Amino acid sequence: MKGLAAALLVLVCTMALCSCAQVGTNKELCCLVYTSWQIPQKFIVDYSETSPQCPKPGVILLTKRGRQICADPNKKWVQKYISDLKLNA
């Protein structure tokens, strides 16, 4: 069962990774699609907010493995992760 959960997490992360796109010449990342799953907080090490030039707001969560996952900044779990990361900075 743990193997299935791990495989599902990898699949979700891969799908979320494909939801970031570069905009403009300054290589700013924008979120086209947000992850539909709450990523376990223990995997998140940093975050960045997308540029105001992006079509919609987003938070790019950085995982321990260096993957970037787009998340909805209005979700409570995303706001909690950001708050916790700021406290531990």
From Swiss-Prot:
CDD domains: Chemokine_CC (cd00272). The gene is CCL18. It is found in: Secreted. Its main location: secreted. Expressed at high levels in lung, lymph nodes, placenta, bone marrow, dendritic cells present in germinal centers and T-cell areas of secondary lymphoid organs and macrophages derived from peripheral blood monocytes. Not expressed by peripheral blood monocytes and a monocyte-to-macrophage differentiation is a prerequisite for expression. Expressed in synovial fluids from patients with rheumatoid and septic arthritis and in ovarian carcinoma ascitic fluid. InterPro entries: Chemokine_b/g/d, Chemokine_CC_CS, Chemokine_IL8-like_dom, Interleukin_8-like_sf. Chemotactic factor that attracts lymphocytes but not monocytes or granulocytes. May be involved in B-cell migration into B-cell follicles in lymph nodes. Attracts naive T-lymphocytes toward dendritic cells and activated macrophages in lymph nodes, has chemotactic activity for naive T-cells, CD4+ and CD8+ T-cells and thus may play a role in both humoral and cell-mediated immunity responses. Residues 1-20 form the signal peptide. One of its GO terms (molecular function) is chemokine activity. It comes from Homo sapiens (Human). Induction: Specifically induced in macrophages by IL4/interleukin-4, IL13/interleukin-13, and IL10/interleukin-10. Expression is inhibited by IFNG/IFN-gamma while glucocorticoids exert a slightly positive synergistic effect in combination with IL4/interleukin-4. Strongly induced in several human cell lines, including monocytic U-937 cells, by phorbol myristate acetate (PMA). Induced in PBMC by staphylococcal enterotoxins SEA and SEB. The Cys-30/Cys-54 disulfide bond is required for activity. GO terms for biological process: antimicrobial humoral immune response mediated by antimicrobial peptide; cell chemotaxis; cell communication; cell-cell signaling; chemokine-mediated signaling pathway; chemotaxis; immune response; inflammatory response. Disulfide bonds join C30-C54, C31-C70. This is C-C motif chemokine 18. Pfam families: IL8 (PF00048). Keywords: Chemotaxis, Cytokine, Disulfide bond, Inflammatory response, Secreted, Signal. Belongs to the intercrine beta (chemokine CC) family. GO terms for cellular component: extracellular space.
